[in-house]
């Protein structure tokens, strides 16, 4: 009886995942055209499809590629995308493995989702869609780490690298706590043969399940997202974008820092900026009154700033620092004040 119940528990989530994704999988047969809007799956290989939402650019206008934060899907970008599309900017959103509609298609996620695989999927997606490079990337948090990894692997394909509160290295508090637990476990159970990686992932799993639902309630929107989020963290936790900065192209990096970020401190992002070669620095903006997920907290302001980058505003390619005030609709640098999109 016990084994029967266990088999049911294993079978149920797999069945639910299949039913969640069945409607979307039909969209994969639709042909993608860079001149037309598109919502659906794009086939990268017989075993791999990614969900895409695409709005084509107006004539002679650029396209921007948005890369999801850790708990994001294409949906969370809506308020940020609207102002860009209204100005004629083309926008490509997609759900990588472990996120959004792509997660539902392949759920449950039972193995680490390696950041290197996500980078290659993005490269293959851009090839498949035949969107011409070099590309404009906007990556939030986890997506910032992915974008930085893409710039390291394919620097010649990057035009603008806009990193919003990006993952630059493991979070020090979490990392130190887990390492302390590993040390304590070694003292209490000296004969146990678990590797450091196995113990690290064990305690990381506990942190994700115990704290993420309270911090990010959206993580409970479907039965698979919490475990998938752990698998995403598991796959990026050893990455150190702060060590990859030498590959960033000239005047490509635009760093966006939320002053009230609850996850990544300003000091950590300043440390990242300091590691970037001066020739690669384009702009750094500190956004006052914004929390970590700035495209939801201040979507009009962030969209305006990204629009100015995409349109090549020369002031934003001099490596200068800016202070942004979304609710005043202003950006300041020294004695200069620039009027921008107001919240």
Protein language model features and the residues they cover:
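Flexible "cap/lid" loop of the alpha/beta hydrolase fold
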Residues: 152, 161-189
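Short beta-strand/loop motif that positions the catalytic acidic residue
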Residues: 248-249, 255-257
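Conserved HGGG/HGGXW glycine-rich cap/lid loop of the alpha/beta-hydrolase fold
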Residues: 55-103
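Active-site loop/oxyanion-hole signature of alpha/beta-hydrolase fold enzymes
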Residues: 96-135
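Gly/Ala-rich beta-loop-alpha elbow adjacent to hydrolase catalytic centers
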Residues: 139-143, 147
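Catalytic active-site module of serine/aspartate enzymes centered on a nucleophile-bearing elbow/loop
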Residues: 280-343
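Conserved alpha/beta-hydrolase catalytic His-Asp/Glu region
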Residues: 173, 192-247
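Conserved loop-alpha-helix segment in the C-terminal half of the alpha/beta-hydrolase fold
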Residues: 256-289
């Amino acid at each position: 009886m016990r084994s029967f119940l266990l088999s049911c528990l294993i079978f149920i989530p797999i069945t639910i995942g299949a039913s969640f994704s069945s409607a979307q999988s039909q969209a994969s047969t639709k042909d993608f055209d860079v001149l037309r809007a598109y919502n659906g799956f794009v086939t990268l290989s017989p075993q791999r499809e990614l969900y895409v939402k695409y709005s084509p650019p107006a004539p002679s206008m650029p396209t921007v590629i948005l890369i999801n934060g850790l708990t994001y899907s294409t949906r969370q970008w809506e308020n940020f995308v609207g102002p860009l599309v209204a100005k004629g900017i083309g926008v490509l959103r997609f759900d990588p493995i472990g996120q959004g509609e792509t997660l539902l298609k392949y759920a449950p996620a039972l193995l680490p989702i390696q950041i290197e695989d996500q980078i290659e999927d993005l490269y293959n997606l851009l090839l498949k869609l035949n969107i011409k490079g070099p590309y404009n990337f906007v990556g939030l948090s986890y997506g910032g780490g992915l974008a930085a990894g893409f710039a390291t692997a394919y620097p010649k394909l990057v035009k603008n690298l806009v990193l919003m509160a990006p993952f630059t290295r493991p979070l020090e508090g979490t990392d130190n706590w887990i390492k302390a637990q590993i040390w304590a476990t070694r003292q209490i159970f000296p004969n146990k043969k678990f590797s450091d990686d196995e113990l690290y992932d064990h305690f990381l799993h506990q942190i994700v399940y115990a704290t993420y639902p309270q911090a990010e309630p959206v993580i409970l929107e479907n039965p698979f997202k919490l475990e998938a989020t752990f698998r995403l963290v598991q796959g990026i936790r050893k990455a150190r974008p702060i060590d990859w900065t030498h590959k960033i192209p000239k005047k490509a990096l635009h760093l966006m820092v939320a002053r009230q970020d609850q996850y990544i401190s300003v000091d950590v992002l300043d440390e990242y900026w300091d590691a970037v070669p001066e020739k690669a620095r384009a702009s750094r903006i500190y956004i006052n009154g914004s929390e970590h997920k700035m495209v939801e907290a201040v979507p009009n302001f962030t969209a305006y700033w990204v629009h100015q980058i995409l349109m090549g505003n020369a002031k934003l390619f001099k490596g200068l620092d800016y202070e942004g005030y979304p609710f005043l609709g202003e950006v300041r640098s020294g004695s200069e004040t620039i009027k921008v999109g107001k919240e």
